[in-house]
């Protein structure tokens, strides 16, 4: 696993959580409007359990990633990796916040991802 793949784990789980939340919300709405809401109850319960599991997994992955990021010596790399992979900000958002060019952000991301690769 590369450093970038390791760091992307949290983003992927976050996307799964959002997807399950959307499914759960739509299923709940259908159950409210439908006279056969008991039919949907098992599916709603399954989605709630899946959401709980994903949130637990997300917390564990986030902790592992943050532990590795904290091992990097360069402060800017740490900040940029945290903003990109934990706060899930775009390169443009990070560049604006840190008063840096997008190329500078990409440079630090690449350096940080390489450093993470050596730590995993």
Give each language-model segment a name.
Residues 1-71, 120:
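N-terminal interaction/assembly modules
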Residues 5, 89, 104-107:
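Short, well-structured alpha-helical interface segments that form or flank functional binding sites
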Residues 66-70, 82, 106:
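Solvent-exposed, non-membrane alpha-helical residues enriched in polar/charged side chains
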Residues 73-87:
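Short amphipathic alpha helix immediately N-terminal
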Residues 93-98:
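Short alpha-helical "recognition helix" segments of helix-turn-helix
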Residues 101, 105-116:
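DNA major-groove recognition helices of helix-turn-helix
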């Amino acid at each position: 696993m590369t450093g970038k793949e390791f760091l992307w784990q949290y983003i992927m789980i976050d996307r799964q959580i959002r997807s399950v939340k959307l499914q759960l919300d739509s299923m709940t709405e259908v159950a409210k409007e439908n006279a056969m809401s008991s039919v949907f109850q098992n599916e709603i319960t399954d989605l709630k359990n899946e959401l709980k599991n994903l949130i637990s997994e997300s917390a564990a992955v986030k902790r592992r990633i943050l532990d590795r990021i904290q091992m990097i010596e360069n402060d800017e790399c740490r900040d940029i990796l945290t903003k990109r992979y934990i706060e899930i900000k775009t390169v443009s958002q990070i560049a604006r916040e840190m008063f840096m060019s997008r190329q500078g952000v990409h440079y630090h991301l690449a350096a940080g991802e390489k450093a993470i690769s050596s730590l995993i």
